[in-house]
Amino acid sequence: MRIYILPILIGLGLILSFNFCKKEESNIALKSTTPILDPSYNYVHTSRFQGQVNPNEPLDNVLTNAKVALGRVLFYDPRLSKTNTVSCASCHKQNFGFADNLPKSIGFNGQLTKRNSMPIINERFNFSFFWDARTRKLEEQVLMPVADHIEMGMEDLNKLEAKLEAVNFYKPLFYDAFGYSKPTLDHIAKALAQFIRAIPSENSKFDQAIGLGFSNFNAQEVFGMTLFREKANCNSCHTIIHSLVTFNKTTLLPTNFLVNGAMTGSGYVSSSSFGGTNIGLDKVSSDLGMGSGKFKIPSLRNLDLTAPYMHDGRFATLMEVIDHYDSGIQNNEHLDDRLTTNNKPQHLNLLPHEKEALIAFLKTLTDYTIVQDKKFRTPFY
């Protein structure tokens, strides 16, 4: 009998082991709730930036409330990941200005992403995406994390169509948005893109100051604004393009204060046509980014919400960022010329009270209303 029992036990063990592994792989623990959508929410609005920067909306994907509502559900739905555990919102959290509070985000299988999650606000006026600016179209960008082998794991995107088609609540949402109830990759991408485009950030203290002649700024914030333009020279990268407001008779408003920045001509000036720069984080760049250790120049909006900072999330505070530019720049062979003096890394020699003033000014660029806006919260309750 023992001769026969052993194979049976081994076979049973293999079956149990296989089923356990299969369950671990698929991880089907989904929320049982369906989305609750408020039809009174209006996402179609005129931005204060329209007329200053052209929106990146393609002609075949006009912004509508129905598309944004569908995109909102997709954005928060973990079904878009292979294991039904990770959604777009897992790495772009409303409480943190639609960025992540981790240096690197956690993917569908527990692995860490290669870079820090960039905030997704005012993307309606952005024309390059990711730290390496690998795409210029938001409709292309939105599906790349879904298919990424670390982030969401749906490497065969065609399976996503069938997966969502099996979810009953999607049928009317797709029909309302596109007049066609069956999910398609094209419509998934368009809806996600429109939800992201609809997320605004235009009510910071700085925004309010534009119409008030900066009379709402305290002395420290005014001093920090002056440092930004002069001694700290921040606006050599976060640059001046549009004359939305005048600081003084000769200095105009750096566009990247207001919007997420775009390619050359819409927000960035750089030796790279994609608005990237090597800022001397390391003597030798382990991540080459756009090439030679260059990374996209990010928006300065909502900095008080979006820590940690840099492409790898290495700095936990704004003070650490300022200390880097003040005296921590490494002499990388590809170091941007704007960060050098006499062919050596710059030393700004900022005093402690100047650093505090610079931080005070940078915080005026944060729109705290975005973390409270119910229109952009999860619809799954």
Region roles according to the model:
Residues 182-219, 223-228:
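Anion-binding catalytic surfaces of enzymes that hydrolyze or transfer phosphate/sulfate esters
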Residues 17-20:
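C-terminal motif of bacterial Sec signal peptides marking the signal peptidase cleavage site
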Residues 23:
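Short, conserved catalytic or interaction motifs in soluble domains
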